[in-house]
Amino acid sequence: MDYILIDTDVILDFFFDRKPFAEHAIQIFILCENNEVKGYTTPVIISNVYYLLNKIAKHDVIIEKLKQLLQIIDIIEIDKAIILEALNSKFKDFEDAIQNFAAENYTTIEIIITRNVKDFQQSKLAVFSPEIYLKNKNP
C-alpha cells in the first residue's frame, strides 16, 4: 500500500471541480476511500482549503465537506522542528517546504501528490502529479 501526502491543489481540484484535474483528484480520493492507498494531509493544507472555499461557500457547508474528507484521509503533525527545517531548507516556497518536511518526518509517507511537482525538487520523497501517479498505479 502506498502512503501519500495530498497537497492543497489536489484537494482544491476536487472541491472546486476544476477541469480537467478534478477527475484525477477524484480517483486519488477513491483509492483512499477503498483503502488501496493511505492518504494524508497537514493542518496547513486544511486551513488553506477552508480559507479558499470560504470565498464561495457557507461556513457550515465547508465544515461538513472537510469532515467528510477527514473520514478518508488523516492529518499529520507539524511542529517546531518541521518549521525550522522548512526555514533552513533550499525550498523556494515556504509552505511547500512545510508540507515536504511534515511528510518526510512522518515515517510511512513515501510519496507527495501535487500538481506543483517542480516546487518539490528538493524533496527526498517521490513526487508525482495525480495523473502520473494514477498511470503508474494502473499501468
Q: In which residue ranges do the predicted regions lie?
A:
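Short, well-structured N-terminal submotif of metal-dependent ribonuclease cores
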Residues: M1-Y40, N54-V61, Q122, I132-P139
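Acidic, PIN/NYN-like endoribonuclease modules and their adjacent C-terminal/linker elements
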Residues: Y3, E104-P139
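PIN-domain endoribonuclease scaffold, especially VapC-family toxins
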Residues: I4, I26-D93, A97, F101-Y106
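Acidic active-site catalytic centers that drive phospho-/nucleotidyl reactions
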Residues: D7-D9, D96, N116
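A generic, residue-level signal for flexible/boundary positions that often mark functional hotspots
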Residues: D9, F15, L69-I72, I111-T114, ...
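Alpha-helix/helix-capping structural signal
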Residues: D9-V10, V44, A81, K118
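Short, flexible helix/strand-to-coil boundary loops that buttress conserved ligand/catalytic motifs
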Residues: F15, L87-K90, K124
